[in-house]
């Protein structure tokens, strides 16, 4: 929100349910994170849905699997953190909060967390106490930036934001980026600020639409013969 608070909404089921809730509240903000979850750790439930939060201050969304989440979870519990979900993702929020409380910035906290995390992940995080940007990180899981007009996006796939922009920056493994509506900064695995190429991709509306099919999986099945050719 513009009043330095975070509107936190989660639903189970169709994305339309979340859209309806957001439309009803009409939150005013210049930044946000969102996520559609394929359940790997924990059942499909509102408690297991993203974004996950820590201490009402750090909020994250995460794609991928944290392989050493059991030991990291136990360590954070010993440090006084309470878990409210069954997911491996929630520990990322607590870990970032832990490092931020040691006088690290969100970017510094993300690098410290990366040293602890084993597995594949694409992460986007917001710190309520420094909510001018979103910090993202990639390791073995797709993550890209989308450059719009007075707006910048992060996503796992170009199709997710194809209706908003055709200009993309594909982040590399180890990259951490800070993004706001006005600018983006990318840092590599060695914490050096770097420049990544901008790729222009024209994606048709047909590629993002379900068309006559009931869902995207059905569409992909019927498109396989053409894809193979």
Segment roles from a protein language model:
Residues 1-216, 223-229:
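Conserved short alpha-helical segments that host acidic/polar catalytic motifs at enzyme active sites
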